[in-house]
């Protein structure tokens, strides 16, 4: 019987990836469609991706697929053949290729069956996710962004918005997408006659958000086709002025792709302009925060002197401290509240 999951330690897999010299292509894609047997679909696709040497993160659900992956460059054409043939709905599915890519974005393939391909918290049988807003191409985005009757709404999390966003975009200040949906409806209740343009990283969240806004009585709803990734690619190809400023946060080892040269965020430790996200080197913390090179050297990659000191303790004592903490701290913690508390600095609302 074929092995349908990874059996090698993360440390070994990461070391192998870092030692690789073969070029790889980082790509993301998603598709909403009905899967009758998500488990069988997952197992078949996993087997084929393993043979191709694909790394990354893939979520499969009855409502479709959501993937961020890394493919050996010399097998990219094979990968497309496999993917396009995996289901009729995936034939010629749009692939968002990374802008900045050193081939080190992922080191293991994880493919999971979930209830939803994006956690939305929607519990309403009358909601139709296929009834989505109008797609906007890059040139249309640029036309609409200066329209006073149009609002651009960022459907990403606070830490994503902080390092980059469309000009004058509205932030829906939350830690999760499921929180954002009802918040966006409430925030825009008095703007139902305006054009509402939703956007996100690659399109998956803003597409569902556009359907949710229509479901809640908004009429003129749009979303950026392919999200920020596709917008930036097309704008550069077509020589259009970039209306997205800063960095596009991505959920892999890179943690960001530079779209424009603007640095709009600040180091959470000293306040100097910086937009480099990192996780605290103390495994008992692992807080996601922004750190400039000077503070990275000063605090040795940690978020605070406390974590810096703890990191110097023997491994056994570090483990004992982690085990003794009440409830612990979630790995890759992205909570805005925890960031404010841990860093002891006021975080701006926008």
Swiss-Prot record:
<dbReference type="InterPro" id="IPR022111">
    <property type="entry name" value="Rhodanese_C"/>
</dbReference>
<dbReference type="Pfam" id="PF12368">
    <property type="entry name" value="Rhodanese_C"/>
</dbReference>
<comment type="function">
    <text>Catalyzes oxygen-dependent 5-hydroxyuridine (ho5U) modification at position 34 in tRNAs.</text>
</comment>
<dbReference type="Pfam" id="PF00581">
    <property type="entry name" value="Rhodanese"/>
</dbReference>
<comment type="similarity">
    <text>Belongs to the TrhO family.</text>
</comment>
<keyword id="KW-0819">tRNA processing</keyword>
<dbReference type="InterPro" id="IPR020936">
    <property type="entry name" value="TrhO"/>
</dbReference>
<protein>
    <recommendedName>
        <fullName>tRNA uridine(34) hydroxylase</fullName>
        <ecNumber>1.14.-.-</ecNumber>
    </recommendedName>
</protein>
<dbReference type="InterPro" id="IPR040503">
    <property type="entry name" value="TRHO_N"/>
</dbReference>
<dbReference type="InterPro" id="IPR036873">
    <property type="entry name" value="Rhodanese-like_dom_sf"/>
</dbReference>
<dbReference type="GO" id="GO:0016705">
    <property type="term" value="F:oxidoreductase activity, acting on paired donors, with incorporation or reduction of molecular oxygen"/>
</dbReference>
<keyword id="KW-0560">Oxidoreductase</keyword>
<dbReference type="GO" id="GO:0006400">
    <property type="term" value="P:tRNA modification"/>
</dbReference>
<dbReference type="Pfam" id="PF17773">
    <property type="entry name" value="UPF0176_N"/>
</dbReference>
<dbReference type="InterPro" id="IPR001763">
    <property type="entry name" value="Rhodanese-like_dom"/>
</dbReference>
<feature type="active site" description="Cysteine persulfide intermediate">
    <location>
        <position position="200"/>
    </location>
</feature>
<feature type="domain" description="Rhodanese">
    <location>
        <begin position="146"/>
        <end position="240"/>
    </location>
</feature>
